[in-house]
Amino acid sequence: MRIRIGIDVGSTHTDSVAIDERNEVIHAVKARTTADVTSGIVESLRKLISEGDINADDVTAVMFGTTHILNAIVQRRGLGKVGALRIGAPATKAIDPMLDWPGDLREAVGGLKAIVEGGHEYSGEEISPLNEDEVRKAAEVFRDSGVEAVAISSVFSIVNPEHELRAAEIVREVIPGIPIVMSHQISSMGLLERENATILNAASIKVMRKAIRSLRESLSSLGLEEVPMFFAQNDGTTAKANYIEKYPIFTVVAPISNSIRGAHVLTGIKDAIVVDTGGTTSNIGVLTQGYPREALEVEIGGVRTNIRSPDIVAIGLAGGSIVRVSGDDVKVGPVSVGYRLIEEGIAWGGDVLTATDVALAKGVMKIDDERCVPQRVKERVPAEVIEKAYAKMVEMLEEAIDKVKTSPEPATVILVGGGSLMWPRELKGAKEVIRPKYAQSANALGAATALVGGVVEKAFSYDHITRGEAIKQASEEAVRKAMDAGAAPGTIQVTEVEEIALPYLPGNAVKIRVKA
């Protein structure tokens, strides 16, 4: 038997699932998420192998959906010191790199920056030649300041990356062996957002290297040292560890994508609204052709970026959300007891009224835990408060669902996540509400079943290149990216080609997006 293991880290629990060649679930488990993330992953994996009676020799891949990078950025902890080099003077000097970043995050990544002459027009022609002397001087300053990675961004490098590539060569000459990230490798249109994502990626390399090293050691301790490691990406695809080590920013919101993708795997439905309810938040996203609908931009740790990421609405309403009653007013969330639910929830003998307590008392959910006694809630909380609180919870969810819809027509809603049991089977604006088997493990299942992929977004001017040649170039680059991420050459197909006119640029400009 060939087994794949998927592991996904949430704010409260770390889920693991083992699947066979037919994507059928063999076994699924939960473990507490830990502050360092890694030990929670190891415990979940150890539990899965033991309880599922899994032979290590049968495991062909372990796929991780991890919050290592998101936690590091949000907590400003463990990030590497970065030298940010922008190519685009004098046109881009009005706004410095990292200017609008939160001060503590800018300090955490070092705040070192330089702007040099160079860059390209949207057509790919030079604005001005790259000033190689300025690049070399900047690299020397970075070296003497002890930077641990360099982030290079250039105007319209997604059209012509020539200046970024040459600048990287010069930096390598000055600082041999230093990790270098170029913005054309990271994201798309929009210099500042692309630059931000590139700097965050460079700062995160140190964190991801440490995480991968730790996870490899953990796999070795479980007899899985020869098993390939993959990491789920923000767009619902996956990539090998050596690729993610270079581009860790591609994993920053992957757990959310895993749940949306897992909903598709569990139901076979390609187009739907997915509600993933955990212990702290509910994330509402959209399935489009079996993959998460993508957002145009995403804020990470207070910084605007334009990396590929799922388009979601997140609300502070989940299993651990605290319910507060003041007279006739009932407020649910956003504060949550999180993983302390089984200690602080009234049904478990605690003193905090939570959303789970309300759903238990309402009778819409049952929990197979002898310590959980719904009668405790009924005895301590008036029935009218339970009714009012539950109505408020449902109203909040329905409003969030409405925000992700693009038409007033009723949509299919799929409920997943550990907290999905607390929702009713009828919701306003939904033509059907589905909670599939293994809904609580949809996130790990999404990681386990993800395919290796590559996405490219490039700008072209049809005054300088034919449409067919532009699509061919973008498609070939997407295939190369998929191969770099670990896809077998003979298995790669171009699955999506999107062409968007750019009317704010002259010369019949377009953006072409290709997914392989």
Task: List the predicted regions and their residue ranges.
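N-terminally biased helix-coil "hinge/interface" segments that flank
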Residues: M1-A516
